[in-house]
Amino acid sequence: MKILVIGAGPAGLVFASQLKQARPLWAIDIVEKNDEQEVLGWGVVLPGRPGQHPANPLSYLDAPERLNPQFLEDFKLVHHNEPSLMSTGVLLCGVERRGLVHALRDKCRSQGIAIRFESPLLEHGELPLADYDLVVLANGVNHKTAHFTEALVPQVDYGRNKYIWYGTSQLFDQMNLVFRTHGKDIFIAHAYKYSDTMSTFIVECSEETYARARLGEMSEEASAEYVAKVFQAELGGHGLVSQPGLGWRNFMTLSHDRCHDGKLVLLGDALQSGHFSIGHGTTMAVVVAQLLVKALCTEDGVPAALKRFEERALPLVQLFRGHADNSRVWFETVEERMHLSSAEFVQSFDARRKSLPPMPEALAQNLRYALQR
């Protein structure tokens, strides 16, 4: 079996590494459009402790402690400057995204999987399908699947809020969610530490707030300073740091009604992206990657494997989208609920996804199935 993985992010790397472990004689190549050092993002949240939770990609590394994971069990929601403290319900693990990606790449290389960077494959819209038995598209929300097959053209929707992903040297020992009224405007911050020295700090606001504050007219530095003043109570004098390519934008939800076509199969955000407010993106990437490994290892041939993979993965992907969309819309319409008491506000926040089957249980059930090979 000869397999090409497009995209050297968590989804493609976990898939390649786990499949190579299960089928060491199969040939697996990975190509990535960016250079080796170009990894966007600050911290990501993962479930459980490495080695104890198979949905945590750190569990597949030989020395996960080198990434200095941070463990979070408490959740703080601030509404009208009044904090409400809660339990996350599960142990969460914050880690630097760049460090995670580099460690997963090293793991693949140690297994004999070649990774080629700055690959022009996607730019030309042509894939060497004749050279491979399977091509895995795991190259994120900006993938150009439409160049390859009409059946996998994504459905793309944009959220109403603007958001930006910052880093900060202020350390947040809890999962923090802050709703801050600033004049006529409302800003929302999602913050948590991912190392001994840094935290993720995601900020979102309505299009109207973004326009009134003239954030689109500011430089990256001026915008970061403005937002830092809005959240000065939380940041305590620490600044906000931006990355090139992570400026203000509307959240893009990318979806598909199917997972594969011919030799092509989708993984990770290339299959389904989900709003950052539910925090399951990397976990989804791991679970769905394991489902594909399971199908390839237990079914007779690629067509049968992809059929079985879609039967298992698509319902999970659709549930993930439902949770993410419900959560995104709640945040986009939060102004309607800012008048509530803090207790009522927390209750509304907790209820925003209660109409759907629980996501953690669905992930756990599918992962247990995938690991029975």
UniProtKB/Swiss-Prot annotation:
The keyword rRNA-binding does not apply. It is an enzyme of class 1 (oxidoreductase). InterPro entries: FAD/NAD-bd_sf, PheA/TfdB_FAD_monoxygenase. Induction: By N-acylhomoserine lactone (AHL). This is Protodeoxyviolaceinate monooxygenase. It comes from Chromobacterium violaceum (strain ATCC 12472 / DSM 30191 / JCM 1249 / CCUG 213 / NBRC 12614 / NCIMB 9131 / NCTC 9757 / MK). It catalyses: protodeoxyviolaceinate + NADH + O2 + H(+) = protoviolaceinate + NAD(+) + H2O; protodeoxyviolaceinate + NADPH + O2 + H(+) = protoviolaceinate + NADP(+) + H2O. Its cofactor is FAD. Violacein production is used as a biosensor for the detection of quorum-sensing AHL production. Violacein possesses antibacterial, antiviral, antimicrobial, antileishmanial, trypanocidal and potential antitumoral activities. FAD binds at residues 2-20. PANTHER family: 3-(3-HYDROXY-PHENYL)PROPIONATE/3-HYDROXYCINNAMIC ACID HYDROXYLASE, BLR0106 PROTEIN. It comes from the Bacteria. Pathway: Pigment biosynthesis; violacein biosynthesis. GO terms for molecular function: monooxygenase activity. Its EC number is 1.14.13.217. SUPFAM superfamilies: FAD/NAD(P)-binding domain. Catalyzes the oxygenation of the 6-position of protodeoxyviolaceinate to form proviolacein. Keywords: Antibiotic biosynthesis, FAD, Flavoprotein, Monooxygenase, NAD, NADP, Oxidoreductase. The keyword Nucleotide-binding does not apply. GO terms for biological process: antibiotic biosynthetic process.
